[in-house]
Amino acid sequence: MDLDAYFYPQGLTLLQRWQAGEAAAKTEIKDVFDAAIAGEFDQNFSILAPADEVHATASVHMLALAILHDIYGVTADEYYKTDPYRYVRANLTVSRLLGVNKLYITWALYAFSCEVLGQKMMYPDKFPPGSDPDHALINKDNCFELETPDFNSRIPKIIDDILRVTEELTGMEPLLQISAPYSLAADIYGQEPLLADVLHDPDHVNKLLDHLADKVLVPWIEHHFSVFPNGWVELSDASGSPFFIGPENCKTMSIRSIQRMDNGDLWGGRVFDCNYRGDY
C-alpha cells in the first residue's frame, strides 16, 4: 500500500467517511492502519517538512486512539503504554491522512505528568486519561513533602521509548512534552483549591510551583537531556494561561516559575513553553 495515495484531501475524506460510520470506510481505514503498524509506511515518515517554510502542525493522539479502538479494540491504557511502534506509527499515519506535513508526536502529557507522581488517574476505554479531580494527590498541608520520582521506569520510560521510536522513524530530534509548574500543580492539587490560593495566598502558590520545578520538572528535564543530548523540551501550561488565571498572575506565577529554572538559561534555549491558548 502507498500512503501517498491518501495525500490531502483524499486522506481527510477517508477520515470523514469513517467518522460518519460508513462500513466501507472502516474496512479501508483498517487496511491503512494494518499497513502502517506493519511498518510499510516507515520510509514515508522519514520525509520531513521543508525547513524554509512555515507549517501548521497538530496533536493527533486522540484521533489515533479513536481509530485504533474502533478497528482493533485497543483501549487507552494499551494504546499509550504497551507498544511504542504501534503508537508512533498510528500517530504519524493520522497526521499524513489529515494532510499535516509537519510531523509532531505527543501524548496525554498533562495526565502523564501527574501520573508519574502517583496521582490517581481515570482511563476510559476510548478517550485519553486524566487525573481524578475527586482525589487530589497533595494538599496545602503535605504538598512540600513531594519528592523526585524515578525517571527510569513506568511513565518516563514509556515516553523515552516513544521518543526513541520517533527519532528512529523520522530522524526528528526528541521532544519531551510535560506540564509546566502551574498546570502540574492544578492537576495534583486541584484546580479550585489552587485558584483560591492564587487569590488569597499567592506566596504559597509561588513556593509550590518552585517546589514542583525543583523536585520534579528540573530533574525530569535533566534526565531527558542525559538520554537524548540532542533533545528539546516543550512545557505546556493551559491551566496557567492568561485566560484561566489572568494576565498578571500568568506573568508572576506561571511564566516566572518557568523562567527561574536553570538559572534562567533554560538549557541553552532548548526548553520552551507553549499552550497558552494561543497567547505565546
Predicted region positions:
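Active-site loop segments of alpha/beta catalytic cores
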Residues: 1-69, 73-78, 101-103, 147-280
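Membrane helical hairpin/interfacial module
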Residues: 88-122
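A contiguous, low-structure linker/loop signature
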Residues: 109-147
